[in-house]
């Protein structure tokens, strides 16, 4: 049996609390420590040594279980290739800590808070542990307020709550990334806020594409990196489950610093929240826990709650979270999406049909929902306008079959008017984005909520029945539609 170096009485080692690897099962390590020197749950452990090929090894693990017999079970945050039994393991005495603050903006990090963008080291003087309790109830800002995004379809029909959680549903190629980048741009310009993007268990190519598009659109400023509007944290598909399970907490920790210390409004993007659950399920099985429904971890609700409850508004600032939600096999009753839905305040659904028509953002106005769309929260005027828009679009949807076969001429005069207004509304829900200027050549538009409401009221009332549909396509506020008519004469 290997002697624990701690027992040898070497003072330098005693100070650091050293153990050794007793067993390795994939990304899970069992580590032996001396009696009385056991690390705490969630403590960060560092494995140091030389691999079988002579390469230097530095692996960080997180303690998950205390097994008895002076052993702990830990999950590795990086590949365990080259590790052997008997290797030295140092207990850092604290949970994993990551850099926070302005130094993180414009940079890409891994789960450990290490920069992975080849732009040199990060100023890590200010760090914060990734495991924290949610803010106390007395610190919360319980006032219900709308988070204005400047995007017409979102603000009118499925408004976001300040400090709320929003689910973003959409397949490939319907504009999720562009919508995310526009939100990052708008919070920076209109609210003086910053954003943190957590790539959880998605494709490495997508992470790279997002980074390149952010640089191209100016969200990340290569010349003045500190003036960038977003910090990126990636734990992609090829990472071990421990990294994918914790990368969301790393991103959240960076966002919490901007909220609590800088007192800013923060947008936190998590893509994809399902992968967070999936990674937790893998780790749970590796730790030997009995699986629950559909093979998920028995601690599913607890893990989801501990992440989601930290995303909230306090009296200092807010974290508003937008989470892409993958629904396995389109089954909304699957425990992973079902547990996520319990925490969401709004859903933004992107439609391939609208994208095919060229209407961007391709947000489905009838499928997207929000708990904030209540008359006592948004006001009677906003609520009535939103309901009028939805009723008009719903009637248009019901008439589609008649329009497709016999044609518009078979409709009553009233229905023809509804169809004409619905088509104008559909086009007015489109909007030129700031981050898409480089692709479209059209200058981006931020539309305030009152301007949005006024525009849709004018369409619903019939004031603009004389304008063509094309006048409403890709404009900002309603005045631009009338100006376009006068300038083109159409």
Swiss-Prot record:
It comes from the Eukaryota. Keywords: ATP synthesis, ATP-binding, CF(1), Chloroplast, Hydrogen ion transport, Ion transport, Membrane, Nucleotide-binding, Plastid, Thylakoid, Translocase, Transport. It is a peripheral membrane protein. The keyword Membrane applies. It is an enzyme of class 7 (translocase). It is found in: Plastid, Chloroplast thylakoid membrane. Its main location: plastid. GO terms for biological process: proton motive force-driven mitochondrial ATP synthesis. GO terms for cellular component: chloroplast thylakoid membrane; mitochondrion; proton-transporting ATP synthase complex. It catalyses: ATP + H2O + 4 H(+)(in) = ADP + phosphate + 5 H(+)(out). CDD domains: ATP-synt_F1_beta_C, ATP-synt_F1_beta_N, F1-ATPase_beta_CD. It holds the Pfam family ATP-synt_ab_N. One of its GO terms (molecular function) is ATP hydrolysis activity. Its EC number is 7.1.2.2. ATP binds at residues 170-177. SUPFAM superfamilies: C-terminal domain of alpha and beta subunits of F1 ATP synthase, N-terminal domain of alpha and beta subunits of F1 ATP synthase, P-loop containing nucleoside triphosphate hydrolases. PANTHER family: ATP SYNTHASE, ATP SYNTHASE SUBUNIT BETA, MITOCHONDRIAL. F-type ATPases have 2 components, CF(1) - the catalytic core - and CF(0) - the membrane proton channel. CF(1) has five subunits: alpha(3), beta(3), gamma(1), delta(1), epsilon(1). CF(0) has four main subunits: a(1), b(1), b'(1) and c(9-12). Produces ATP from ADP in the presence of a proton gradient across the membrane. The catalytic sites are hosted primarily by the beta subunits. Belongs to the ATPase alpha/beta chains family. This is ATP synthase subunit beta, chloroplastic. It comes from Pinus koraiensis. The lineage of its organism: Eukaryota, Viridiplantae, Streptophyta, Embryophyta, Tracheophyta.
